[in-house]
């Protein structure tokens, strides 16, 4: 059997694993939320995180242990959850990614399911695509007349 091209094909999961510093989408959600909750006081707690993510505290504890093993955070049983430097960096990047995707969807006038769609998309795009989306959002933010023209164009196509 001859190869289809010079590139190797992988399953979707393997493409994700090949990404630098791979975290599962669920782990990314935890790191992002810990970052959000920790911004004011520098820490959060299991129950606060469970409430914010709509999960049970034992699920939080299990994930926190994994993230602690990855050196992204410090956690002592029944204590504070504190992001380490790599966790802070990752959390900041994840929140930025979330905000960029959300801004893009708002630019497209997505209203129904905005948070859900943002969450789905943010885990599936790479940095090159994210940078392109960020540039596009920034371009339209700085050129409101063109955004108006774009929205008029979209309206005429419906």
Predicted regions and their residues:
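N-terminal leader segment of winged-helix/HTH proteins
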Residues: 1-22
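C-terminal regulatory/oligomerization modules of transcriptional regulators
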Residues: 3, 122-158
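N-terminal helix-turn-helix DNA-binding core of bacterial DNA-binding proteins
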Residues: 17-55
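Hydrophobic structural patches
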Residues: 34-38, 67, 105
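Canonical helix-turn-helix DNA-binding module
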Residues: 46-78, 85
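Arg/Lys-rich, alpha-helical DNA-contact motif
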Residues: 93-132, 136-139
